[in-house]
Amino acid sequence: MNIYPAIDLKDGQAVRLLRGDMDQATVFNPDPAAQAAAFQDQGFRWLHLVDLNGAFAGRPVNADAVSRILERVTIPVQLGGGIRDMATIEEWLGRGIRRVILGTVALRDPDLVKDACRAFPGRICVGIDARDGHVAVEGWATTSDVRALDLALRFEDAGVAAIVYTDINRDGAMGGVNVEATADLAVHLTTPVIASGGVHALSDLLALKAEAETGIEGVIVGRALYDGRIDPRQALALTAGPEDARC
């Protein structure tokens, strides 16, 4: 199971929000590129970036910070936030982002997601952020009447690389990941699912790994890495598969 350390970008800095509230942002590193390099040095194989300002603005805002991160690391990077048209998708993939995550546009314009999957196979993820089971968009500011599973099923045959599923009520709250909801989503899909929101201890990683057969491919970890609740080496060892043990 992959661990995706998260770098959420707000005003050019690496921050963590509480339940998606931009007014409750804690700055963990004013230099996101240095943070990205540190995660790479710790042994992580992926990075998960979110342009928080972009998610609210509907367009890239922290492009300079993302570019500096890409200059510092060699591991693959996935990026979400403010990516809502084909031109922006093409721009980011051309600049070195391995995968883009489409959230709001997946609800508003599902055909764009399908077109992007055809144009860029294996490089398009769908981000489904749920509040009480319903999809939230526009930087989590608006909650729709669409259920998370119903949205995910729309893309079953589209060639989406992964579904990034976030439980908003758990995000940044350090109350534990919603394993049950994530596994329930994954078991109904053929698309791999990446869990997000609320990871606070190694026990969360073990609980998710125990549900790997449902289709949970990875987990995004944020605040717990920044405040030391999760030790990177222990986390990587716990989630390693047989192929990692042979390395």
Swiss-Prot record:
It is found in: Cytoplasm. Keywords: Amino-acid biosynthesis, Cytoplasm, Histidine biosynthesis, Isomerase. It comes from Rhodospirillum centenum (strain ATCC 51521 / SW). Pfam families: His_biosynth. It catalyses: 1-(5-phospho-beta-D-ribosyl)-5-[(5-phospho-beta-D-ribosylamino)methylideneamino]imidazole-4-carboxamide = 5-[(5-phospho-1-deoxy-D-ribulos-1-ylimino)methylamino]-1-(5-phospho-beta-D-ribosyl)imidazole-4-carboxamide. GO terms for cellular component: cytoplasm. SUPFAM superfamilies: Ribulose-phoshate binding barrel (SSF51366). It is an enzyme of class 5 (isomerase). InterPro entries: Aldolase_TIM (IPR013785), His_biosynth (IPR006062), HisA_bact_arch (IPR006063), Isoase_HisA-like (IPR044524), Isoase_HisA-like_bact (IPR023016), RibuloseP-bd_barrel (IPR011060). This is 1-(5-phosphoribosyl)-5-[(5-phosphoribosylamino)methylideneamino] imidazole-4-carboxamide isomerase. GO terms for molecular function: 1-(5-phosphoribosyl)-5-[(5-phosphoribosylamino)methylideneamino]imidazole-4-carboxamide isomerase activity. The gene is hisA. Signal peptide: none annotated.
